Amino acid sequence: MEAIIKPQEVKVGIAEWQVLRAPGRLITLGLGSCVGIALYDSLNRMGGLAHIMLPDSSQFQDRSNRAKFADLAILDLVAALIGRGARRGRLVAKIAGGAQMFTSGDRHLSLLNIGQRNAAMVRQTLQELAIPLVAEDTGGNYGRTMIFDLESGDVLIRTIGRPLKVI
């Protein structure tokens, strides 16, 4: 009898990142205003997934959990991928999340739009690192789940009440 090998599935929690090689999938749940960043090296079929909460670490004294912040998590994820054999020049990015989960009549609260700021900082950091952003599913007012398939590089976006989307 032939053994069936099930690909590894690794969950990525809020303010965490993980790296994995194919075959396998990285999954993060509950992306509201948070942003999920999938980085992929197609030749090595390896990638990483980060689930960031905040755009910028500069306003915080406690930066002990670097995975919380877009500006630091992406740097650390890139370093981890390179440390495991990925080539920086081959990395591409796909992102999801950055939603406006709460609406308010208060103009001041609207200016705090953390989802939009998270997505903007992720784009800026990727651009500064010269990592092409090849696909995204951001904005709106709904949560998302990201499922990153390391075999194909596809990122599946699951949203309640919407069709499954592949980016």
Curated annotation (Swiss-Prot):
<comment type="function">
    <text>Probably deamidates glutamine residues to glutamate on methyl-accepting chemotaxis receptors (MCPs), playing an important role in chemotaxis.</text>
</comment>
<protein>
    <recommendedName>
        <fullName>Probable chemoreceptor glutamine deamidase CheD</fullName>
        <ecNumber>3.5.1.44</ecNumber>
    </recommendedName>
</protein>
<comment type="similarity">
    <text>Belongs to the CheD family.</text>
</comment>
<dbReference type="InterPro" id="IPR011324">
    <property type="entry name" value="Cytotoxic_necrot_fac-like_cat"/>
</dbReference>
<dbReference type="Pfam" id="PF03975">
    <property type="entry name" value="CheD"/>
</dbReference>
<dbReference type="GO" id="GO:0006935">
    <property type="term" value="P:chemotaxis"/>
</dbReference>
<dbReference type="GO" id="GO:0050568">
    <property type="term" value="F:protein-glutamine glutaminase activity"/>
</dbReference>
<dbReference type="InterPro" id="IPR038592">
    <property type="entry name" value="CheD-like_sf"/>
</dbReference>
<keyword id="KW-0145">Chemotaxis</keyword>
<keyword id="KW-0378">Hydrolase</keyword>
<dbReference type="InterPro" id="IPR005659">
    <property type="entry name" value="Chemorcpt_Glu_NH3ase_CheD"/>
</dbReference>
